[in-house]
């Protein structure tokens, strides 16, 4: 059995180009996603890439709503070849972003605060309910 091809860090554009059949990079990007899905390749997906994808894909007409974007991103994160740090927290943040109407950065900070027990320091009290907020009164 041969070892999977190590792709390194996976950039946002791979996941965007793979959505558009008329894009010149579509075939290669789809092939890379297929290799990640079947485990013949591995790559790291950083939280910054997830953030950028939530931003870009929400502004394009490819997906009807945030929940559809979340399903696409969760599908990629579930691929055997996709590696990421702190997957449970990343998935929690993605779920909050999709269902609560908050920005991904706020969803990520809240999920991290809940996972680590650390407080949030923010003027924005609305999006950080449930965790201590150390912003001075």
Model regions and ranges:
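Short beta-strand scaffold positions
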Residues: 10, 44-45, 84, 104, ...
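Short active-site oxyanion
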Residues: 38-43, 80-81, 115-119
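Active-site-proximal, substrate-binding regions of enzyme catalytic domains
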Residues: 54, 58-80
